[in-house]
Amino acid sequence: MGKNVVVLGTQWGDEGKGKIVDLLTEHATAVVRYQGGHNAGHTLVIDGEKTVLHLIPSGVLREGVQCLIGNGVVVAPDALLREIVKLEEKGIPVRERLRISPSCPLILSYHVALDQAREKARGEFKIGTTGRGIGPAYEDKVARRGLRIGDLFHRERFAAKLGELLDYHNFVLVNYYKEPAIDFQKTLDECMEYADMLKPLMLDVTAALHEMRRDGKDIMFEGAQGSLLDIDHGTYPYVTSSNTTAGGIATGSGFGPMYLDYILGITKAYTTRVGSGPFPTELFDDVGAFLAKRGHEFGATTGRARRCGWFDAVILRRAIEINSISGLCLTKLDVLDGLETINICVGYENEEGAVIDAPTDADSYLGLRPVYEQMPGWSESTLGAKTLEELPAAARAYIKRVEELVGAPIDIISTGPDRNETIVLRHPFG
C-alpha cells in the first residue's frame, strides 16, 4: 500500500520546501507540481552544490524518481527549456524523468508584457509580482480563452487562437498601457519551435497518478509559494494567482483529496515575505538585519531581499486549519543561534486593545499590533544537528512552545541547507 504525501508552505513562501521535497523523495516514485509557474524558486543543496529549480519538481535530482507537472501549473516554454538544458549540463537526464500535462496553460510573451506593464502602472501600490506573466496566464485560463500546451501540436488551430488573443491583449497594451504591441508571426514561430521540443514530454498526468496509486506507489505533491499567498485564503490582493493550499492538489492534478495520506506544512523558525503586503511581525531593527544576513534571505527567483520578522503563530494556526496539516517541518532553526531572546507572536491587538484572530484580507491588517511572548534564546550552534538531543535546551523549549501554540506536531527540523542537516522525528512516508 503506497502513501501519498503533500509538502507545502504555510507562510508567505520561501520556507525551504525544496530541500525537504528532495530529502523525502528517497521514498517516492513520483513528485508532482500542481500549481504556480516559474515564479517559484526551490533551492536544493546536495553535498555543498546548490541547484535552484523553478518549474521542474525537486525530485529531478533523484535517480529513478518521475517528475510530473500537473494541469494546474502555468508553463512558460522558454523558461522550462532553459531549466532543462541547465540541468542536463550538470549530467541530469531531465527528459527521461520529466512528463507534463498537455492541459497546462501556456505563459507567452504577451502575458509577461501585461504583467510588467501593470506593475509599472501601479507605482507605489504594486503587488510585487515576479513580472513573469503568471497572473495574466491564469486570467486567460479562467476567462476560457487561454492557450494550453496541447494546442501547440495543432498549428492552424493554434495560430487562429493566438491571433485572436493578440488582438485582444495588444489593444490593452498599446491603448491603455502605452506599451509596444507583441508581434504575431514572431510569437507563432517561437511557439512552433517549442512544440517540437515539448511533444515527447507529454503525458496524461492524472491517469498516470491513478495508475501509480492503484499499483501501491508512493507519490509526493510539491507545493509552490506559501499558504498565505493563496488566491482565496491569502492576504488578498497581495497574493499569487493560484491555490497554494492543499485544495489545489485536486484541481491542479486530478488527484482527489481522499487519496492523500499526510500533509506536511513547512514553516521557518521565523517569518519572511517578499514584495508588498501585510506583515505584522516585520522587524526594521538590527534583529531583522541579523535574520536576513544569517538566513541569506534573498529570493531564489528574483534575487529580491526578503522582509524578515518574528515567528507568527497566528498565521500558522490558520494555515494548519485550511490545509488540514498532519505535521510540521520547522526550517532554518540554526538562523536563530546567538539571539539572546526570541519573540513569538501569539495574537494581534487592534487600536482598542482587543486581541483578534487572523484577518482574511490585507486591509483588515491595518492598525493591528503583534502580541508577543518572549522566550530565552541560545548561544550554542544548532547547525547540522541530526538528533533532538543535540539541540540546546532553549532550542528544544522553543520547538515545544511552537507546537503548543499552533496545535500541530513538529515532525521534521531542518538545521542547515544540506539534505543531511535534518532531524526526522516522524517520517511522512513511515
Curated annotation (Swiss-Prot):
Its EC number is 6.3.4.4. The active site is at 14 (proton acceptor), 42 (proton donor). One of its GO terms (molecular function) is magnesium ion binding. The keyword Transcription does not apply. Binds 1 Mg(2+) ion per subunit. Plays an important role in the de novo pathway of purine nucleotide biosynthesis. Catalyzes the first committed step in the biosynthesis of AMP from IMP. PANTHER family: ADENYLOSUCCINATE SYNTHETASE (PTHR11846:SF0). This is Adenylosuccinate synthetase. The gene is purA.
